[in-house]
Every structure is written in structure tokens, then in C-alpha cells.
Curated annotation (Swiss-Prot):
Result of changing residue 5 to D: Loss of all functions
Family according to the record: Belongs to the relaxosome TraM family.
Organism: Escherichia coli (strain K12)
Alphabetized NCBIfam families for the sequence: PRK13713.1 (NF010267)
Originating gene: traM
GO CC terms: cytoplasm
Biological function: Conjugative DNA transfer (CDT) is the unidirectional transfer of ssDNA plasmid from a donor to a recipient cell. It is the central mechanism by which antibiotic resistance and virulence factors are propagated in bacterial populations. Part of the relaxosome, which facilitates a site- and strand-specific cut in the origin of transfer by TraI, at the nic site. Cooperatively binds 3 regions in the F plasmid oriT locus; 2 are required for autoregulation while the other is required for plasmid transfer. Bends oriT DNA less than 50 degrees. Plasmid specificity is conferred by the TraD-TraM pair.
Protein name: Relaxosome protein TraM
Keyword flag Coiled coil: yes
Phenotypic consequence of residue 76 to E: 100,000-fold decrease in conjugation efficiency, but tetramerizes and binds DNA normally
Length: 127
């Protein structure tokens, strides 16, 4: 283990001591929560955060690509469900039941979607 001498601000020093005190109050032994061990743990944690940030910069999230992929999946799902509803409405098991006629199923879905959308995106009086 390498030994390093460094200077830190009084604020950082007080915060590290506060962490040590809190751990001791929680029952940690004196030798388990030394200033050196706590400062080392915080330094390692800071390095991991720094590395994660650098990694994120290299492989930045592409919102446009995500939106495109999401829209593609939604359109595929919508198209598939429309075909399945069409097939289901022709089934002899549901013939004569207006609840399962294609036009009625579509209207029912639109009403339910509209209701859910209103919950999350209430309409303004201006619209």
C-alpha cells in the first residue's frame, strides 16, 4: 500500500471526522474507523465516480437514437396488435358478440388510452 501525504481543506477534514464519529456511534471499533482508512475509502469512491463520468463521456447517451428505437418498437407493437385484433374479431367463438367486433374493440381501446393519457397529461383549457 502506497503512503501519500496530502493537504486537504478544513471543511473536508471536518466532514471526514464526522463520518468517523458517526461510525463509532454506530458501534464500529476504534481501529476499524481510522482517519486514514476513511480518507482512503472516500478517495477510492471518488476515483470510481470520476472513471464512471469519463466512461459516460466516451459513450454518451444518444436521445435521438433512443427515441427512434422506442418509436419503432411502439409502431411494430401497434401494427401487431391491430392484426391480432382483426384475427380475433373473425373467430367463430366471439361472432355475434358486439363487444368483440373490430370497430367496437378499437373504439374501446381509444377511450381507455385517452383516459390514461388524460391522467398523466391533463388537457389545458387553452387547447
Amino acid at each position: 500500500m502506497a503512503k501519500v501525504n496530502l493537504y486537504i481543506s478544513n471543511d473536508a477534514y471536518e466532514k471526514i471526522n464526522a463520518i468517523i464519529e458517526k461510525r463509532r456511534q454506530e458501534g464500529a471499533r476504534e481501529k476499524d474507523v481510522s482517519f486514514s482508512a476513511t480518507a482512503s475509502m472516500l478517495l477510492e469512491l471518488g476515483l470510481r465516480v470520476h472513471e464512471a463520468q469519463m466512461e459516460r463521456k466516451e459513450s454518451a447517451f444518444n436521445q435521438t437514437e433512443f427515441n427512434k428505437l422506442l418509436l419503432e418498437c411502439v409502431v411494430k407493437t401497434q401494427s401487431s396488435v391491430a392484426k391480432i385484433l382483426g384475427i380475433e374479431s373473425l373467430s367463430p367463438h366471439v361472432s355475434g358478440n358486439s363487444k368483440f367486433e373490430y370497430a367496437n374493440m378499437v373504439e374501446d381501446i381509444r377511450e381507455k388510452v385517452s383516459s390514461e393519457m388524460e391522467r398523466f397529461f391533463p388537457k389545458n383549457d387553452d387547447e
